[in-house]
Amino acid sequence: MQLLDRILGQPCRLCGRRGAVTLGPVSPTHPAAFETTDFRLRHCRHCDVVYLDPLPTAGDLELLYEDSVQFSDSHYTDPQQVEKILDYYGTSVRNLRLLPDSGGRILEIGAGLAWVSRACKAIRPDVTTVAQDVSSECATHCAWVDQYFVGALESLPARGPYDLISLTHVIEHLADPEAMLRSVASLLTQDGKAFITAPFRPTGWTPDQGVTPWRTYSYLHVPAHITYFSRDWFAQTLPALELDIVHWDATHENGQAFELVLRRI
């Protein structure tokens, strides 16, 4: 087994194929008493994903998301910043034709302050907005959300179907992103859309550069960000989930973040 690992690389946690190599060690970037403090980044030659290894423990995830305050600083509250965020999401839902028709339904997963719901309500007030998050931090601060559910997605009472589901800077936090996408597919209407944004990689990074550029990457959040995805991984994974890529753009923030739209087929 060790010989195979040296020759072919270790099995990738995301695609399962041999080809995952270690880029190098990374340390926690969040000040907390985590159970695990020794992490490394791995890159898969087959699906081109970079992921954190080992996975954070359940206790560390609870510490990150349920026992901490995430949305109180000026990045989320300054009026100019709020206007900038809403302009981006409003422009995106228009240009990418994501806005449901009158009476349509929107689900925001890992919603936080539910920016997509807010942008959609501003354009079309009669859409129904549902937000889900495991933290209650923002649940009473989102007047633009018709129903804010605090709890796991599988416990969501409003099971859909939805015309639009958004996961904005959410999927990179998940230990099992494929399972989440399967749930998304089950909650979408036929031809419904999913809007996903997430960190991509350091500007201009290539695997031969190793781990060094990652250590100064603004989106290296250890252990919060578990996976840095690629278009290849989505293209390999989605057909079995009855989802299709209709838009991919990895040029955001000078190539540091991507925007993805999926369609239920």
Where are the regions that the model predicts?
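Conserved N-terminal segment of class I S-adenosyl-L-methionine
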Residues: 1-168, 177-181, 195-197, 220, ...
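Feature marks short, surface-exposed loop/turn motifs that line or immediately flank catalytic pockets
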Residues: 138, 191, 202-204
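Histidine-centered divalent metal-coordination motifs
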Residues: 169, 173, 225
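Short glycine-rich, flexible loops that bind phosphorylated cofactors or substrates
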Residues: 173-174, 203
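Helix-to-beta-strand junctions that scaffold the AdoMet/dcAdoMet cofactor pocket
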Residues: 174-175, 188-190
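Short, glycine-/aromatic-enriched active-site segment of Class I SAM-dependent methyltransferases
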Residues: 198-227, 232-237
